Amino acid sequence: MAGHSKWANIQHKKARQDAKRGKIFTRLIKEITVAARMGGGDPGANPRLRLALEKAAENNMPKDNVQRAIDKGTGNLEGVEYIGLRYEGYGIGGAALMVDCLTDNKTRTVADVRHAFTKNGGNLGTDGCVAFNFVHQGYLVFEPGVDEDELMEAALEAGAEDVVTNDDGSIEVITAPNDWAGVKSALEAAGYKSVDGDVTMRAQNETELSGDDAVKMQKLIDALEDLDDVQDVYTSAVLNLD
């Protein structure tokens, strides 16, 4: 991970998220509902639900909305049943893309995803065409200036798998997916507050894009993220947009 301007990418990512905040609640409600349906309504015994509730809290989702989503998932309230789908494909410069969806209409979703790829210079691929390049892991990013040795000691004590210092001075803590929320809570209790973090599918081999290619790739990612059925978009692309 070292060598990339992680800090600049975080600021760009946050600006895009703020612009799309209106869709965040809808996606969180879907995720909470599905997580509760698959693993039950107790976040202590359901890591996927616990992660979804962490995100809901970070985005100030009203507790009533959260509880209704859980109740729909556990069957206490009637609701739409969503299925999870994953699509794989290629973007600008052959950069890999994985698109996770929750939908009640598979035919609509695949048509929308294919259209977004085709219209924006990408290609929808076959199952498994890029998945081999991604690893499922959690990460937490801390701003430059944090004491690396002290953070590393606290992170490893909390159950993190690795700690990486990027060239721009930011520090990244890597966790197993199911350990992410626990490590985050433990570090916050120790006085370390992350500026970014999530459980994600991270590319092991990245594709750096700059200039027009980076702009085109961002447009493709935005088109996919704007689809109602899309929950997450993962890519091997590292965009140099400055």
Curated annotation (Swiss-Prot):
Pfam families: TACO1_YebC_N, Transcrip_reg
Alphabetical keyword list: Cytoplasm, DNA-binding, Transcription, Transcription regulation
Gene Ontology CC entries for this record: cytosol
InterPro entries associated with the record: Integrase-like_N (IPR017856), TACO1_YebC-like_2nd/3rd_dom (IPR048300), TACO1_YebC_N (IPR049083), Transcrip_reg_TACO1-like (IPR002876), Transcrip_reg_TACO1-like_dom3 (IPR026564), YebC-like (IPR029072)
Compartments reported by the entry: Cytoplasm
GO terms under biological process: regulation of DNA-templated transcription
Keyword Cytoplasm: yes
Protein's UniProt name: Probable transcriptional regulatory protein NGK_1508
